[in-house]
Swiss-Prot record:
It comes from Mycobacterium tuberculosis (strain ATCC 25618 / H37Rv). Its EC number is 3.1.1.-. The gene is lipM. The active site is at S261, D357, H390. Belongs to the 'GDXG' lipolytic enzyme family. This is Probable carboxylic ester hydrolase LipM. GO terms for biological process: symbiont-mediated perturbation of host innate immune response.
């Protein structure tokens, strides 16, 4: 077989392989093809890109086919276009699902808060004179949004260097003498990585634009550090915010805590263990209460292995995070599980999870919410989003923008309930 013929055959085989990969990527977005082992990491990443950005995915698929179609034989070209057509239908439906995610979020809020709930936050807190709504969503904008809002960065709240730094997001014209509500953001990263910059930008930029102060923290990671160092740092940062946020125009009496993945776990645990001395060594008297919790795709039960834990999670916890076998020290795993600490005094919760989550099974959220609703006296809102993967809110997709608005509405209801009878001050622009 001559070189030209060999190149021709390779080109045809390559086109069929690309068509198969295209089809698999679209199918994976609807139903993850792997939930175990390292393959699940690829399933998650590809699913995240396809479900949150289906139209750019479609454009790249069709563009590649257009560029190569003339060099394909008629049968191969026909198969490639047929597969592309079915993939296009699937991707267009995913785009529609993302743009209409507000329907599921609205239904969740109506169910958890009642149909008479607030649907806007106007008039609840003092807003900057130029404050509006969140900017147009998009992944490119989210890459630079930090520069628009983070005006106080790398503030130390503890003794462990960069691991104990936090950033404060606010509009530059926010009244520093005011009492803006505060969002406290904890990054995810399997307790081993993650940074205060790069996560929850759609939510923080949306709330900062509306007059909130958002605090994003770092905390100590494993394997260099061992549980419960992570939650101790979260509590220490909370204590710092309570003591100092008024210097930046924030209200220490209204703090909503949030985070995704490991941050979802830590935010829930912090919300359910206010002033717990086990997690506040050396600062037991500090106030670490929060007024609301909004965890995203978190791990809520370290002991539920059969149907609600990724197979790689327990080895991670035993070898790198807790560093003890679960069977030898079950109490540590129970203490680290937010579900263990649910009580009637739990703050209002808004739990969000993707139904297609390949890394943290949705059963974690379902079980946690069921327990919360049975015990807590406060509202519990649960949004389970179809065709949605882990870390869906990382960049500025349509679904992430809808989610930011839904969180605003939830927090507006909580804020209004806790501030009934009070009036916000006038909007003030700072020159």
């Amino acid at each position: 077989m001559g070189a030209p013929r060999l190149i021709h055959v390779i080109r045809q085989i390559g086109a069929l392989v690309v068509a198969a990969v295209t089809a698999a990527a679209t199918i994976n977005a609807y139903r993850p093809l792997a939930r175990n082992g390292f393959a699940s990491l690829w399933s998650w990443f590809i699913g995240l890109v396809v479900t949150e950005f289906p139209l750019p995915t479609l454009a790249s698929q069709l563009g590649g086919l257009v560029l190569t179609a003339q060099r394909l034989t008629r049968p191969v070209r026909a198969v490639s276009w047929l597969v592309a057509a079915f993939s296009a239908l699937g991707l267009l439906n995913l785009s529609r699902a993302g743009r209409q995610a507000d329907a599921q979020l609205t239904a969740a809020l109506d169910s958890g808060l009642g149909p008479d709930r607030r649907t806007a936050s106007a008039g609840l807190w003092r807003r900057p004179a130029g404050g509006g709504t969140a900017k147009t969503p998009g992944p490119l904008r989210m890459l630079r949004i930090y520069r628009d809002y983070a005006h106080d960065g790398d503030i130390s709240y503890g003794e462990y260097g960069r691991a104990n730094h936090l950033d404060i997001w606010r509009r530059p014209d926010l009244d520093l003498t005011g009492t803006a509500p505060v969002l406290f953001q904890i990054p995810g990263g399997a307790w081993t990585t993650g940074n205060k910059r790069g996560q929850a930008h759609p939510l923080m930029s949306h709330l900062a634009e509306l007059g909130w102060i958002c605090v994003a923290i770092n905390y100590r990671h494993s394997p260099r550090n061992t549980w419960p160092d992570h939650i101790i740092d979260v509590k220490r940062a909370l204590a710092w915010v309570k003591a100092h946020i008024s210097e930046y125009g924030g209200d220490p009496d209204f703090i909503a805590i949030t985070g995704g993945s490991a941050g979802g776990h830590l935010s829930s645990l912090a919300a359910l263990t206010p002033n717990d001395p086990r997690f506040q060594p050396g600062f037991e008297e500090a106030d670490t209460r929060v007024q609301a919790a909004v965890p995203f795709y978190g791990v809520y039960d370290f002991t539920r292995l059969q149907d609600a834990m990724h197979p790689m999670m327990l080895p991670l916890l035993e070898r790198m995070v807790v560093k003890q076998p679960r069977t030898a020290n079950m109490q540590s795993y129970l203490d680290a599980s937010p579900v263990t600490h649910i009580s009637a005094d739990a703050p209002p919760f808004f739990v969000l999870h993707g139904r297609n989550d390949s890394l943290v099974p949705v059963q974690q959220a379902r079980g946690f919410v069921d327990q919360l609703r049975q015990v807590s006296k406060q509202p519990v809102v649960y949004a389970e989003l179809p065709f949605t993967q882990h870390a869906f809110d990382l960049l500025g997709s349509a679904r992430a923008a809808h989610t930011a608005i839904a969180v605003e509405q939830f927090l507006a209801e909580v804020y209004a309930t806790q501030h009934a009878g009070s009036e916000p001050g006038p909007a003030v622009a700072i020159p």
